[in-house]
């Protein structure tokens, strides 16, 4: 640090003054040159640097929370290192009794605190909002309201009434304090990043709605593209999709087994009584289901029925389908199912 005080030596008095100033500066900065040993157990503190906040104000707040011990030394160090205008906005995970130098380094590098959240495939908006809320990222009610916000939907040119299906399943690292609308934007942009190549071949509504149905209907990876082909074939033939997954979406609560009465509920999502696509997606599909719809297996299948073990029987005709259903029902009766 002596090079900071390289004035010309014109007299003994000037030399003495320069040496005294240099020694004083070294003494001031001494706490930054060694790690401070905490006198008592440290406690984790979440500290927010606000937009436009001055270094002196930040230092005073750090001192008041016992994160640092010398707010003046923090300010001096920031100025000497040219970092007094480089402290970045955000929420930081700090602890009490840190050295001023360590805190300064974290705040100038923008080493903000983050939280990781994994969103699996096939979740609905309410389930995603619940996971984000449990992780401390958003408030559930606020987030769900934003998922139906018309301005945000218009921002992404979404043709549906909500962001159902568009919050892409992935593992995210969100900074603490992130705005809920920015959480939504991150997840929607991730969807379009993944789906962009597929949207060159298939419209958004067809891709997303069918992929969401495939996500809920398919259990085995190798069957996704076959199931997608069944629904696409039925659309081309003008037949109802007849997806149990859409009935489950329309029901007010989850049921382990659907009844014939459920298949007649009056809902635009009831694909047993309505032809064409339902009004929107029924969950957030993963990449595999999106790809299955964009590149379906070439088949003539129009029907499938669950074997009960996750796999399905596929049929080309209604007669073959009914025969297979009777066979499965007999097997289940014998097994007491």
Give residue spans per PLM region.
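Leucine-biased recognition of intrinsically disordered, low-complexity hydrophobic segments
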Residues: 1-4
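Positively charged n-region of N-terminal signal peptides that target proteins for export
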Residues: 15-18
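Bacterial N-terminal signal peptides
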Residues: 22-29
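Signal peptide-directed extracytoplasmic domains
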Residues: 34-196
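Bacterial extracytoplasmic/cell-wall-associated proteins, especially those involved in peptidoglycan
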Residues: 130-138, 144, 152-337
């Amino acid at each position: 640090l002596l090079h900071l005080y390289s004035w010309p030596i014109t007299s003994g008095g000037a030399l003495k003054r320069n040496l005294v100033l240099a020694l004083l500066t070294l003494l001031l900065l001494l706490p930054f040159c060694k790690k401070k040993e905490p006198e008592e157990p440290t406690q984790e503190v979440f500290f927010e640097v606000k937009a436009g906040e001055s270094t002196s104000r930040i230092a005073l707040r750090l001192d008041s929370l016992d994160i640092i011990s010398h707010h003046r030394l923090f300010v001096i160090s920031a100025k000497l290192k040219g970092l007094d205008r480089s402290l970045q906005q955000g929420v930081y995970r700090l602890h009490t009794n840190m050295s001023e130098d360590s805190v300064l380094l974290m705040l100038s590098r923008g080493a903000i605190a983050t939280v990781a959240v994994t969103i699996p495939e096939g979740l609905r908006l309410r389930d995603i909002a619940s996971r984000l809320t449990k992780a401390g990222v958003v408030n559930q009610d606020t987030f769900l309201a934003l998922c139906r916000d018309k301005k945000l939907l218009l921002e992404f040119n979404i043709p549906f009434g909500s962001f159902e299906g568009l919050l892409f399943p992935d593992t995210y690292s969100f900074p603490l304090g992130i705005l809920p609308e920015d959480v939504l934007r991150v997840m929607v942009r991730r969807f379009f990043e993944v789906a962009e190549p597929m949207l060159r071949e298939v419209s958004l509504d067809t891709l997303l709605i069918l992929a969401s149905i495939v996500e809920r209907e398919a259990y085995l990876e190798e069957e996704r593209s076959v199931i997608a082909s069944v629904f696409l074939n039925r659309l081309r033939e003008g037949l109802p999709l007849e997806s149990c997954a859409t009935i489950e979406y329309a029901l007010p609560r989850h049921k382990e087994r659907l009844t014939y009465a459920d298949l007649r509920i009056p809902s635009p999502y009831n694909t047993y009584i309505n032809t064409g696509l339902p009004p929107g997606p029924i969950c957030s599909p993963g990449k595999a289901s999106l790809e299955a719809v964009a590149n379906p297996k070439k088949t003539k299948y129009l029907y499938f029925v669950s074997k009960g073990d996750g796999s399905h029987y596929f049929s080309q005709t209604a007669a073959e389908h009914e025969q297979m259903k009777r066979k499965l029902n007999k097997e289940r009766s014998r097994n007491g199912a």
